[in-house]
Amino acid sequence: MSEKPASMYRKIDKPSYTRRDYVTGIPGSKIAQHKMGDLQADADDYPVQISLVPQEECQLRHGSLEAARLSANRHLIKELGEGNYKMQLRKFPHQIIRENKQATGAGADRVSDGMRQAFGVPVGTAARIQPGDQLFTAYCEVEQAAAVKEAFRRAYNKITPPCKINVERGETLLVR
């Protein structure tokens, strides 16, 4: 069975559903890692801090978070090298997504239960994003800032809400 479109889960219209100790059968997260680049470096070692900030409230599924992380990280590795930056994915997909499976095709009315016991089974997880939250943060040198901005531009093409790239620290260094 194929995955349902992300638009089914995008809006935050239900209470949070995160209690993993009560729910069985939750698929594992696709996110491979949350910290990338030079893991030993401290954030203060780099003069520039750039963040990707969504502008709308939504839920992002773990697959789209991983796709955005992969595209940004690959670009940074190619442009800057493995240990010349530090990047962090700041959101974790806690929200459990449920789906009431529906049978289709010939004889589906005899097999399917319709809306009886329609609570659904867990099919994945999502992160709840509020406007102004930092989704990704990267730390780099002044001359690497353009590559980080390009990496974040590639990342926000993989996710739904409109995003802004904020220079959190070192903005005066970039103006020169």
UniProtKB/Swiss-Prot annotation:
GO annotation, biological process: translation
Q: Which UniProt keywords apply?
A: Ribonucleoprotein, Ribosomal protein
Name any one Pfam family assigned in the record.
Ribosomal_L16
The protein's name? Large ribosomal subunit protein uL16
HAMAP family of this UniProt entry? Ribosomal_uL16_arch
Look up keyword NAD and say if it applies: no
* MF terms in GO: structural constituent of ribosome
Which PROSITE patterns does the record associate with it? RIBOSOMAL_L10E
Cellular component GO terms, alphabetical: ribonucleoprotein complex; ribosome
Give the domain of life: Archaea
Which protein family is named in the record? Belongs to the universal ribosomal protein uL16 family.
Q: Which NCBIfam families match?
A: PRK04199.1-4, PRK04199.1-6
